[in-house]
């Protein structure tokens, strides 16, 4: 056996046979051990050869394993290294001879299989008994390896290379496993034109992610199957090449190149009958290159592309095409670009209508046409970082999935009843242990109540199961209908018109009638527990879940809340009616849908002296909209006093440190597009900083340092300033005109002047500040009571027209907070006490004491 040259797979099989014989306690390795080993290999060629010979490899493997299990077992030290017996050696010799006849340099696993079948062993008898004779196996070689010779140690990776490393899209289209492609006729026609050229017949589809590049190729596969293509493409096979699986497991240098070459040779050998598709085309640049080798996949296919021997359709995004393909001009010139643009909202609705039935069948729900329109419109308006039709399809898919989950989950009424029944059952167990008369009477009543609740529960469960069964029936019928339609198309292509007539005029109308009856039963049910229809409201809920933007119809409670927005804001911001009304009107316009959808919800410049409530109003708006005053983007403009600091807002430009981190403003709004943005103390910033806000105020968009467009159309922009504070309204406006450029002022929705606070208004602020202090003390279970005289004292002493309400906060802190802290530390006041604050010593100070 010195001249025996096994391939890598054959060596692995021989090693596996040795290990199995050793583990089984067999004293020698027999042909059956080898047969089990070669059929058990994951990527082996022996199993496909048996299949080609008309034999089931799984049956042979199971029978061979039985033979191995029946061999005599021995014990001793030489069991760790059993030797091949005479029959096994004969099989190896026969396979070496056959390899020589075939012109192979190495013995591959399928040749070893033929060698086993040629011998006289129990394994050979098993193969012959199942029809896998030596001649049958030799004849099957042709279908697996063709005319290829084994000239390397890993030839198995090259046999049936196309089958291993590609997906036949035309086969999937024939089986009806590809979604229909709606529209895109122009792009498909252009692809067909390029493919029909004599040389450089290689179109590359370029477009943004999610616009439907791969779908165009799937549409081409469907057209090839339907025969709706020119003569040059009729009957051709369209395959999708999987470079990932080609690279995966290529352990040795040159192994990837061998696999790719085998694929390319098979494609060349098909004489133009195969059209190849590579998704993510940029991956061919650099794929397989290692160390000093420059021979990557891109360089290997260049000659074939230039000569027209390989018809290749590629798909990649604009950025990746520029980054990888355009750099290699020799590769780029071999491709013809086909630009795939984003479809319009109207075209997207058409695409969704074409896909609707597939999603209805998959999820077992109905999808309203108005829901498809809503998905296209809402995704276009609110999900700006992605592209149609992908984002609209995702919306419909998730909305249907959400509905299906609700159908499969137990309804709320049943959950509530089950909780009641469980509680009553626990009470019943507890009461059975009691012996007094009252407990026995209570037990009687409880058992009666429990019986009623159980009856109600079983009725509800039966109703739910019935409704669910009808919905499941519709789903089953629709799946059946889709299968019949696919079968009908296949029969029509094959010319079996009798079968077509039977399906189209018999079984399909019958099923459609059943579906209509079942859907009528669902629709006609009163007080239905389950909803099985995707409506625009469900789509809007999904949009809200994705973006945080309330896109759905307003509930009654929200309508009342919006109508009374001034009252809510007025509780926190005292004496600024004009400002509160301006902001409230902007929010109402946006939620009612009458605002300009291409501008921010509102943009305001708040002017006024310090401490009158400018920043407080921005916090109040955030609390009103998001139930949290901190849920806003706050930019302190005093940090942007230098010209270059604008880069902090939108992110550093390319080449600078921190380029990939994004800007403080743009990143915050990208993460949360529905928010309040507060630019505090704008007069402190450098004037050039406001130039970047011009596009935000006018078009609701801003481009960040990485070239991404950030959507500001659902934000409220509030700028605060105390320019001209202390002067008249006219003086304030003059100061604004001096500080800001006219084009900036002109883009604001409103400039709101805050009035100085009067002493009466300060009395209301005293109430607000004291209630905030009381809230902080509630953690220690302290109850705070401030007398009217003390409140008046605070309002008088805390009033300063130049500084607004801030001196009052300091006064409360000093007059009440400091004393209270000392009393708590001294133990005079303990947790849970009532605290009284009153005027003392003829109004000289406030006294804080425990109320008895």
Curated annotation (Swiss-Prot):
Residues 1-147 form the Clp R domain. One of its GO terms (molecular function) is ATP binding. Homohexamer. The oligomerization is ATP-dependent. Residues 558-756 are annotated as: NBD2. Pfam families: AAA, AAA_2, AAA_lid_9, Clp_N, ClpB_D2-small. The lineage of its organism: Bacteria, Bacillati, Actinomycetota, Actinomycetes, Mycobacteriales. PROSITE patterns: CLP_R (PS51903), CLPAB_1 (PS00870), CLPAB_2 (PS00871). One of its GO terms (cellular component) is cytoplasm. This is Chaperone protein ClpB. ATP 2 binds at residues 608-615. Residues 343-548 are annotated as: Linker. It comes from Corynebacterium efficiens (strain DSM 44549 / YS-314 / AJ 12310 / JCM 11189 / NBRC 100395). Residues 84-147 are annotated as: Repeat 2. Residues 393-527 form a coiled coil. GO terms for biological process: cellular response to heat; protein refolding. The gene is clpB.
